[in-house]
Regions:
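Glycine-rich loop at the start of a catalytic domain that most often binds anionic cofactors/ligands
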Residues: 14-25
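Short, active-site-adjacent cap segments at secondary-structure transitions
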Residues: 12-15, 71-73
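A glycine-rich helix N-cap at a beta->alpha junction
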Residues: 23-58
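Flexible, low-complexity linker and terminal segments
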Residues: 40, 47, 93-107
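Short, low-complexity, polar/charged sequence segments that are solvent-exposed and flexible
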Residues: 23-26, 82-86, 105-106
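Short coil/turn connectors at secondary-structure junctions
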Residues: 1-3, 58-61, 99-102
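Short internal beta-strands
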Residues: 3-9, 64-67
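A charged, amphipathic interaction segment
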Residues: 45, 49-96
Length: 107
């Protein structure tokens, strides 16, 4: 089944070459940022963000990064990861590409 992961606003940092996502604040788990929470998960034997991202790449997921989100957050010049095939787009592109009988999950 085809899957597209759509990254917008600060989530765009997850696809940046410099792992800036690790510094993003989190609202759960008692951690101050994404990196601290991810490290805690790793110590508990839970798959890390990098492991899950690599699994999505291996399974052929599409990664779409929101052009408006990049501009709105001043990230349009941010170098992107070279281990993830990222395609630019927007919400309209994402919705247009969505299957009529598929599902959209927002987390």
């Amino acid at each position: 089944r085809a899957v597209t992961l759509f990254f917008t606003m600060d989530a765009c940092k997850a696809l940046g070459a410099d792992a800036a996502w690790r510094g993003l604040p989190v609202g759960q788990g008692g951690a101050k940022d994404g990196g601290t929470l991810d490290d805690r998960y790793e110590a508990q034997g839970v798959a890390t963000f990098e492991v899950l991202l690599a699994a999505c790449v291996e399974m052929g997921a599409t990664f779409m990064i929101c052009e408006m989100g990049l501009r709105a957050r001043g990230l349009d010049a941010m170098p992107l990861r070279d281990d993830v095939p990222v395609q630019p787009g927007g919400l309209v592109t994402f919705l247009n590409d969505a299957s009529k009988d598929g599902a959209i999950i927002f987390i």
